[in-house]
Amino acid sequence: MLDLIQTRRDLHQIPEIGLEEFKTQAYLLDVIEKLTTGKDFVQIRTWRTGILVYLQGSQPERTIGWRTDIDGLPIVEQTGLPFASQHQGRMHACGHDFHMTIALGCLERALEEQPKNNLLFLFQPAEENEAGGMLMYEAGAFGDWLPDQFYGLHVRPDLKVGQIATNTHTLFAGTCEVKIRFKGKGGHAAFPHEANDALVAASYFVTQVQSVVSRNVNPIEGAVVTFGVFQAGTTNNVITDTAFLHGTIRALTQDMSLLVQKRVKTVAEGIAAAFDMEVEVELKQGGYLPVENNPALARELMDFFDEKDGIELIDIEPAMTGEDFGYLLSKVDGVMFWLGIDSPYALHHPQMSPKEEVLAIGVAAVSSFLKKKAAE
């Protein structure tokens, strides 16, 4: 039987950035091959650093998918754990080591007997940086294994062990990276009339773009426009010719995201025109669409977990954080949910360390749900 805690600790020590998960893939394949030995109803495919494990059903009417992400983050770990990251500047600070371990535990249980319906276990790379789910879908990696229903989870530090939270609508926001560069004309600070100050134009933009959320977004729906980077100039007495802004747009529906993207671009272009300078606007959403749960499937999942001993189900509000599972759920009906890990430190924090008793709880809960779906 799979040692869940040791498996998680092994994976925790080898975090890798998206599409560079070579050690992670090798480790997963080794475990998967041992688990599936002698199981003639199992097929395995790889796509770059991703893995697909397909269990052929005995009398299949549909394919049920379970997805886990496998990549780490460019963070220096500060947990002090004896099994801390062995990769300098890399850490499983978003719980993907937990996600993988739970998926392996569920795979082990699913292999106990051939399911009635097909099951697909997806070990997806590059959730954090390249929207690996979108890359795999667009590359045709699923082929005829594309699920009819897709499910997945994400650990959540502020929920207690034994708590599962989701809803029947949107769980995560869609996110869009924004890069804006104003291009004016540099000059000496003493002669501003001979220059065209990109810093001033960019400052006007930062102020004016705040009106996008306050005046273009329905307050009931909500959206976020945040710029965390503003770079301009190198010395105090020189007017800079360029100013660079780097930010994010977040919205709970794709229509709202597209509206906000359009307005941000329009405001930037309007400011540039007013200051008689050029502007470059780069909007990159890619596969980071809102994670929209299918209402009927979400209700089914919530009712199932609500009746499970040891599980406290929470109907939770959407989060403005992003998750690339939204892309796959835009193609296939499905559900994502939160799994409580009771950590005082947030996701992406260098000291984030979930409680390991969650592993057995997660495997028991998810595997029982997948068993039900596979038998329908």
From Swiss-Prot:
Pathway: Amino-acid biosynthesis; L-lysine biosynthesis via DAP pathway; LL-2,6-diaminopimelate from (S)-tetrahydrodipicolinate (acetylase route): step 3/3
EC numbers, comma separated: 3.5.1.47
TM segment ranges: none
Family annotation (InterPro entries): AcetylDAP_deacetylase (IPR023905), Amidohydrolase (IPR017439), Bact_exopeptidase_dim_dom (IPR036264), Peptidase_M20 (IPR002933), Peptidase_M20_dimer (IPR011650)
BP GO annotations: diaminopimelate biosynthetic process; lysine biosynthetic process via diaminopimelate
GO molecular function: N-acetyldiaminopimelate deacetylase activity
EC top class, as a word: hydrolase
Active site: 69, 128
Reaction equation(s) it catalyzes: N-acetyl-(2S,6S)-2,6-diaminopimelate + H2O = (2S,6S)-2,6-diaminopimelate + acetate
Domain of life: Bacteria
Keywords: Amino-acid biosynthesis, Diaminopimelate biosynthesis, Hydrolase, Lysine biosynthesis
UniProt cross-references to NCBIfam families, sorted A to Z: amidohydrolases
Role according to the record: Catalyzes the conversion of N-acetyl-diaminopimelate to diaminopimelate and acetate.
Family statement: Belongs to the peptidase M20A family. N-acetyldiaminopimelate deacetylase subfamily.
Name recorded for this polypeptide: N-acetyldiaminopimelate deacetylase
